[in-house]
Structure formats: structure tokens, C-alpha cells
Amino acid sequence: MTARSSLTIVLAAGEGTRMRSHLPKVLHPVAHQTLLAHVLTAAPKGTGTSLAVVIGPDHQAVADEARRIRPDAVTFVQAERLGTAHAVLAAREAIARGVDDLLIAFGDTPLISAETFARLRAPLANGAALAALGFRAADPAGYGRFIVEGDRLVAIREQADASADERKIDLCNAGVMAIDGRRALAILDKIGNANSKGEYYLTDAVEIVREQGWESVVIETSEDEVRGINTKAQLAEAESVMQARLRKAAMEAGVTLIAPETVYLSADTVFGKDVTIEPFVVIGPGVSIADGTVIHSFSHIVETTLGRNVSIGPYARLRPGTSLGDGARIGNFVETKAATLEAGVKVNHLSYIGDATVGANSNIGAGTITCNYDGFKKHKTIIGQGAFVGTNSSLVAPVKIGNGAYIGSGSVITRDVPDDAMALERNQQTIREGGAARYREMKTRGKKPEK
């Protein structure tokens, strides 16, 4: 059987004024990805699918984000905000090309899943003209109610127009719909604006379908999945739901979370097996963690690749461009950025390793700094395999430390060090016999010590 073709239209033209932000609403993040990115990721993809995003005027950033996530996305501008049906018809050109299934979603519902989109499409394959997504609301006040007769949806009644009995209905409209693509324009073009706001409401499609003698059905999902984001408080609620999902998925995949509610993950985090994460860890976007790795408490990791059996933290910060080989160790109060640390490297305490490559099995002593910035440009430090860098050393880039080289503690290294060489740079130590006793005596007499 040939797979059904689909067009997903994502409505993302809203101003989001209640967010109190200069950022378009759909570009706010949940689990380190934009609201829009979550919806576009869940939308059908692959052969026979197409995607349209309806944006508002002057929302080029939204168009750019859509194409970043889904290069196949085509954007359309809703010049005037005259209701949801009006927004859908902004993409008339895409609808007119003809598909089996037309899906209509909202760019501010980041919790919707690919599985729900698939369930919503299923009735269309069986002849339904429209399938509407609904949920059982804990508090239905303010939502449109689904009026059903048997298995059929006959109307969506807004709160203001609902009777006393209809207001008792807890099956509410999520706004997401699937419409038979071959009948979509015939339905949408019949929607009028004879209402107090003079707007074109997508919900009117249900009664138009009924008038035509066609079938509309309801597909139920959880209230969490169709949460719309209009305020920063709702954004925080969605974050909480998403984090709970991500934590559960991680643990089901074999990750040990010691205190799950204290760990914050990104939607794109990739875990191997037998990974352990201690309390109060933040994992930002672009992080991949291989088997057996342990992340200790209060570590913050972004755009980083961790090999197998790596140990991180506690109190470590791994910034973008960090890559750690198998068995590498990053200890407490260590920061890395744009750094490749090969297998077995140890940076156990109080160090900054930036714009650097560290060869396998090298040891970087406490307090070591790669001095990568000269006030104008960043420069690279290259440390060979099996090197030993003593504590409190400064490596002034650009500089190369050879394989097996030793750097004495307290050194400021400004020139390349050959393989197996020892480099030591510090002032000669001066010892004055009895000097401490004389100093104390002078201080107690209120006199300055002799030079």
C-alpha cells in the first residue's frame, strides 16, 4: 500500500505579547530547544511529506529557525492576524498542490509527539474528512468543548456560547486538526467571519463538515501534550513536563540518575549505557555521553562529546567544542572550551584548558592555565602524548609541548618544548638563614625588617 502524502502547516504568527519579551514566542526555549523546534521535529518527515510554517510580518528569525530545524520548511506570511483559519489559508499555495492529509498544528505546543500526529492522521485513511485533537481537562473553564454524538464530533462550542450542560463537558479542543487534503480548501473556504471579532475560526470547520454530510472524529491525548505556551509561567510548566519526560527516557535507556528531579537535560542529549549522573547537573544542547561515564554533582556541560568511562566533576564546566577520549578525567573546578583531551588524560583540579589539544595519557597539574587570548585573537596550545605539566603552570599560546615532556611547577612557558624535554621557568629561590626569626623580632618592636 502506498504511503499517504501529507502537508503539515504550523501556525507561528502570534505576537506572544503575554510573554513580555522582545523574542518571538515560538523562539523561547524548552529543554534548550525552541518551542518551534519541538513541533517541527515531531511533524511528519520523509518521502511524501511537506511542511509549511505561517509567520507574522517582520519575523525573519522565526523563518530562519524553521529552516534550521527542517530545511524542507516553506514559510508563508500572515499579513493580518484575522484568526486561525485565516492563518491556515496564508499557506493556500501549499494546500492547493494537493496531499492526502493536511495537518494543522501550533508552534507554541512543544510537548506534542510524532505518535500523536500519526494517530490524528489515521481516521483520514478510513474516510473521515476531519480529525480533531482533544484532551480531558482538569479544569475545562475557558476551553472550547467538543460536542459529540456517538463516535462523531458535531461541533466545537466555545465557553461563551456553551449551555450549562455543555460547560460540564471536560473533553476540550486542543486546536490541532487533520483534514482530508482533497477536501481541505472546500472546507476552509466556507469558513466565514460573522462573529464579534470578525475573525475566521478554524473550529467552524467541524460544522461545515457536518453540513456536507462528511465525518469528523475526535482523537484524545493527555492535557500535558497539548499545553500551549502564552506566558513565562506556562513556559516553566512545559519545561517541568519536558524534563520529566527526558529523565524517564534516560533512565529507561540505562542511565542512573541519583536524584532525577535535580538533573536538567537537553532534548538532544545522547546517552550510552551505564552512565551515572549525580545530583544538580545541567546538560545543555549538543552533548553525547558514552557508556560508563560518570558526571559528578554541580557540573555544567554544553556541546561536548564524552567517551567511555570518563569522569567529570564535581563542579566542572565543559563548554562548546570539548571532546574527551575514553577514560579521561576532569576534576573539580576545571573549565574546558574548544579542547580535545585524548584517552586517559587527567585534569583533576583548578585548571582552564581552552583552544587546546592534549595527547593521550598526559597529566595536567592543578592550577594549570592555557593562556589562549592575547587581547585580540585566540591561539592554540598543543600538548603531546604522555606529557606532564606541573602545578600552577601557565602555557602561553601559541605553544607546543612535545610527547613525554615535563613542565616544572610554577613555570610560564612561552616557547615550544621538544619531545621528552624538561622545561622549568621560575626565579631562583633565595634562603636567608634565621631571616624568619629576625622578621618576627622586628615586627614585635614595630621596626621594619632589614633588607
Curated annotation (Swiss-Prot):
Q: Please list where the region (Linker) is annotated.
A: 233-253
Q: Tell whether Transferase is among the UniProt keywords.
A: yes
Question: What residues form the catalytic site here?
Answer: 349 (proton acceptor)
The region called Pyrophosphorylase is annotated at: 1-232
**Which molecular-function annotations from GO does this UniProt entry contain?**
glucosamine-1-phosphate N-acetyltransferase activity; magnesium ion binding; UDP-N-acetylglucosamine diphosphorylase activity
Q: Name the job this protein performs.
A: Catalyzes the last two sequential reactions in the de novo biosynthetic pathway for UDP-N-acetylglucosamine (UDP-GlcNAc). The C-terminal domain catalyzes the transfer of acetyl group from acetyl coenzyme A to glucosamine-1-phosphate (GlcN-1-P) to produce N-acetylglucosamine-1-phosphate (GlcNAc-1-P), which is converted into UDP-GlcNAc by the transfer of uridine 5-monophosphate (from uridine 5-triphosphate), a reaction catalyzed by the N-terminal domain.
Record-linked PANTHER family? BIFUNCTIONAL PROTEIN GLMU, NUCLEOTIDYL TRANSFERASE
Listed A to Z, the keywords are: Acyltransferase, Cell shape, Cell wall biogenesis/degradation, Cytoplasm, Magnesium, Metal-binding, Multifunctional enzyme, Nucleotidyltransferase, Peptidoglycan synthesis, Repeat, Transferase
Q: Which NCBIfam families match?
A: glmU, PRK14353.1
- Cofactor binding mode, per the note? Binds 1 Mg(2+) ion per subunit.
Subunit-level organization: Homotrimer.
Residue sites binding acetyl-CoA per the record: 366, 372-373, 409, 426
User: What are the binding positions for UDP-N-acetyl-alpha-D-glucosamine in this chain?
Assistant: 11-14, 25, 78, 83-84, 144, 158, 173, 230, 319, 337, 352, 363
Per the UniProt record, the lineage of the source organism begins with: Bacteria, Pseudomonadati, Pseudomonadota, Alphaproteobacteria, Hyphomicrobiales
User: What positions does the entry give for Mg(2+) binding?
Assistant: 108, 230
Q: What does this protein need as cofactor? A: Mg(2+)
Q: Where is the stretch described as N-acetyltransferase?
A: 254-451
| Family indicated by similarity | In the N-terminal section; belongs to the N-acetylglucosamine-1-phosphate uridyltransferase family. In the C-terminal section; belongs to the transferase hexapeptide repeat family.
**Annotated protein name in UniProt:** Bifunctional protein GlmU
A GO BP annotation: UDP-N-acetylglucosamine biosynthetic process
- Gene this chain is encoded by: glmU
Q: Which Gene3D superfamilies match?
A: Hexapeptide repeat proteins, Spore Coat Polysaccharide Biosynthesis Protein SpsA, Chain A
A single cellular component GO annotation: membrane
Which pathway does the database say it acts in? Nucleotide-sugar biosynthesis; UDP-N-acetyl-alpha-D-glucosamine biosynthesis; N-acetyl-alpha-D-glucosamine 1-phosphate from alpha-D-glucosamine 6-phosphate (route II): step 2/2; Nucleotide-sugar biosynthesis; UDP-N-acetyl-alpha-D-glucosamine biosynthesis; UDP-N-acetyl-alpha-D-glucosamine from N-acetyl-alpha-D-glucosamine 1-phosphate: step 1/1; Bacterial outer membrane biogenesis; LPS lipid A biosynthesis
Q: Could you tell me which Pfam families the record lists for this protein? A: Hexapep, NTP_transf_3
Could you say which EC number(s) this protein's record lists? 2.7.7.23, 2.3.1.157
